């Protein structure tokens, strides 16, 4: 049957519809808001896939160009691989739902979200989260939670649910909040140096919106929800667990001590203890024994945190690992930094380019989009001592790069102050947790070292959480094991004045805003400590860019002169580029950017452009060239392509009968501009001769 439920979020209304489309899926919901329409389906395999080793959940989000009345650009007119925006939205959907599936559930599950109609003023990705939550809720998939997601904007201290593109661009804060009726499960944000209190207010506002949407989903469940398939999470054999614990606890506790052992040495010791312990078990117990060993490893970690109040490497809960910073480490690179924090190390480089180097983006929203600042994050296998393929960026790398880019964007100067395209690349050379935060810190340092006039450094810190019941421990600057066995990965980036980027993922059903408030304050203290180290290494941006970077010179011309610079079919501008070897970008408002690594070439191009676009000024003297003689005077070129009339009466101080007695074509003479009448320029040589004679007379006196 066809069912519709409407949710009111104040200025925005969301409609949930099911029973008309994709009826063979386990769950299918069409979400509408304005002209935006998103179809989300949830499907599950009948049999589990235990060989996967992890929950085999796949999320695919597609923004079809037909949704915006467009045809894909380029030669291939069919949608191809996912765009960066689509990949990030896949992660945005995956992260809040993954921890809510039952422990040990191994049936392949797939979420597909398709944007069928695009509203020119609304981002559909928050609707995709809502559709996913609704599709799972009404399906027979054993997903027991009702959750929702919402985008929150803030302007003039007021929070807005699902702001429009226009509102989002004007917003001081852009945050996506996902939560159940009981608490928060995921947060992702970009901001303009906002306070912790403002962020917390946005999260609380977003959670209230999530509750309203969840109530609508519950209403839909009552109308058409299927009976959930039975699933009981597997439990460990207590007898085998006790034997594994007896054999391994002492040695395993020592192996996990990273204050005593470095990361790779710890891994090797753990593997050795595991091998010895499992080999001692009967063959029929080995598979269960391996699971018991992994559970024991996690149990030791959590007991150390909550009962002994001790981290694996011996740090205090709010202590940050040792930081070392080197700037300018690569000679030919425009900007570079080697940032090391504990056993995590990032080599971050900056390349400066021109407007031609901007990243063009094809989006559903109207108009053309491009990026002049981009950050690319790489995670090669050697960073964790492994062998692997060097393929293109995966979803994780794209997600980490987007977080770092978002955190730094708030401090990137506008094009009017710094007309360069900037590409930051963060290569993770070593990793033991918080590598994305190393990308942010290293990126800020490398940008300043490259001469990008940022007004402040941006630092980042990853927070963790270990929680059981009412007991919990919040950790600052988490290492790899703390991320793996902990319950939260909460990344916070910003300046001394406020937060610019944030991302939170959890492995428990939800956390309260009270815990988030405490974590934000602890993160603020950690961020300030890191920023102090960064300012010691690079107090402010270099005043000059690298000698190997292109110099960009900016000049402004009248808009009616643009055609003179470009010429018919681009002939003139191509000629300037071929003659000087520079790059030239002309904007519609008459702004011209000339880029070249060679100053002389740039100056030559600027002079040509200045000559092409120059306008005569009354009373000013010019060195002109006689280009044509006529009976009533001569036409003199004072700028390339710009002639003025030198009347016969203005050629000499005495009366002349024939112009050719005084001038011939090709002569270079000094002339003064007497008057401007529309496009006509009146010149005088007589006035210049008179001035010269009077100066000579004064000199003799």
From Swiss-Prot:
Keywords for this protein: Cytoplasm, Magnesium, Metal-binding, Nucleotidyltransferase, RNA-binding, Transferase
Q: Which reaction does it catalyse?
A: RNA(n+1) + phosphate = RNA(n) + a ribonucleoside 5'-diphosphate
Organism whose genome encodes this protein: Solibacter usitatus (strain Ellin6076)
Location of this chain's protein in the cell: Cytoplasm
Enzyme class comes to: transferase
Which protein, by its recorded name, is this? Polyribonucleotide nucleotidyltransferase
Q: Where is the S1 motif domain?
A: 619-686
CDD domains reported in the protein's UniProt record: KH-I_PNPase, RNase_PH_PNPase_1, RNase_PH_PNPase_2, S1_PNPase
Q: Which gene encodes it?
A: pnp
Recorded hits in Gene3D superfamilies, A to Z, give: GHMP Kinase, N-terminal domain, K Homology domain, type 1, Nucleic acid-binding proteins
């Amino acid at each position: 049957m066809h069912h519709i439920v409407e949710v009111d979020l104040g200025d925005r209304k969301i409609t949930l519809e099911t029973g008309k489309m994709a009826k063979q899926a386990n769950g299918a919901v069409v979400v509408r808001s304005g002209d935006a329409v998103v179809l989300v389906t949830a499907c599950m395999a009948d049999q589990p896939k235990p060989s996967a080793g992890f929950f085999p959940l796949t999320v695919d989000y597609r923004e079809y160009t037909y949704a915006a009345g467009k045809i894909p650009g380029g030669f291939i007119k069919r949608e191809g691989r996912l765009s960066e925006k689509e990949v990030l939205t896949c992660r945005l959907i995956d992260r809040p739902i993954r921890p809510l599936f039952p422990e040990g559930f191994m049936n392949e599950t797939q979420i597909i979200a398709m944007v069928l109609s695009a509203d020119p003023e609304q981002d559909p990705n928050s609707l995709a989260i809502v559709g996913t939550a609704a599709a799972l809720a009404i399906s027979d998939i054993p997903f027991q939670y009702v959750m929702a997601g919402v985008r929150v904007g803030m302007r003039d201290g007021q929070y807005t649910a699902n702001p429009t593109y226009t509102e989002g661009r004007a917003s001081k804060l852009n945050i996506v909040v996902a939560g159940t009726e009981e608490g928060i499960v995921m947060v992702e944000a970009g901001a303009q140096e906002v306070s912790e209190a403002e962020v917390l207010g946005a999260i609380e506002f977003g959670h209230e919106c999530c509750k309203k949407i969840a109530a609508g989903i519950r209403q839909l469940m009552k109308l058409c929800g299927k009976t959930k398939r039975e699933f009981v999470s597997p439990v460990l054999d207590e007898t085998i667990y006790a034997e594994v614990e007896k054999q391994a606890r002492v040695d395993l506790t020592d192996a996990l001590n990273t204050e005593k052992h470095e990361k790779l040495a710890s891994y090797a010791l753990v593997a050795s203890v595991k091998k010895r312990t499992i080999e001692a078990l009967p063959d029929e117990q080995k598979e269960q024994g391996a699971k018991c060993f992994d559970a024991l490893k996690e149990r030791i970690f959590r007991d150390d945190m909550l009962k002994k109040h001790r981290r694996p490497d011996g740090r205090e809960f709010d202590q940050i690992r040792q930081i070392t910073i080197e700037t300018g480490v690569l000679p030919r690179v425009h900007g570079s930094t080697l940032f090391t924090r504990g056993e995590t190390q990032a080599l971050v480089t900056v390349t400066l380019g021109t407007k031609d180097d901007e990243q063009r983006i094809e989006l559903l929203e109207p108009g053309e989009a491009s990026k002049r600042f981009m950050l690319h994050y790489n995670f090669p296998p050697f960073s964790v001592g492994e062998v692997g393929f060097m393929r293109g960026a995966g979803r994780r790398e794209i997600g980490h790069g987007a977080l770092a880019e978002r955190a730094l964007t708030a401090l990137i100067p506008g094009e009017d102050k710094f007309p360069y395209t900037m590409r930051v690349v963060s290569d993770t050379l070593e990793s033991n947790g918080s590598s994305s935060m190393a990308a942010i810190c290293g990126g800020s340092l490398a940008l300043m070292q490259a001469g990008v006039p940022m007004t402040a450094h941006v630092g980042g810190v990853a927070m963790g959480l270990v929680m059981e019941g009412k007991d919990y421990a919040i950790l600052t600057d988490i290492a790899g094991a703390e991320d793996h066995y902990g319950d939260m990965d909460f990344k916070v980036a910003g300046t001394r004045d406020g937060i610019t980027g944030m991302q939170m993922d959890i492995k428990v059903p939800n956390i309260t805003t009270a815990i988030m408030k405490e974590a934000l304050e602890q993160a603020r203290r950690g961020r300030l400590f890191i920023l102090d180290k960064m300012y010691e290494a690079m107090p402010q941006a270099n005043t000059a860019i690298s000698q190997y970077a292109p110099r960009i010179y900016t000049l402004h011309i009248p808009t009616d002169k643009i055609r003179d610079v470009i010429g018919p079919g681009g002939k003139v501008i191509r000629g300037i580029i071929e003659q000087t070897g520079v790059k030239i970008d002309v904007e519609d408002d008459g702004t011209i950017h000339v880029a070249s690594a060679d100053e002389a070439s740039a100056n030559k191009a600027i002079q040509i452009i200045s000559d092409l676009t120059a306008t005569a000024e009354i009373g000013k003297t010019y060195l002109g060239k006689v280009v044509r003689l006529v009976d009533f005077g001569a036409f003199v070129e004072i700028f390339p392509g710009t002639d003025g009339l030198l009347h016969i009466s203005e050629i000499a101080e005495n009366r002349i009968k024939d112009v050719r007695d005084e001038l011939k074509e090709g002569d270079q003479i000094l002339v003064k501009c007497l008057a401007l009448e529309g496009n006509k320029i009146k010149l005088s040589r007589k006035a210049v001769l008179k001035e010269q004679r009077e100066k000579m007379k004064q000199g003799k006196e």
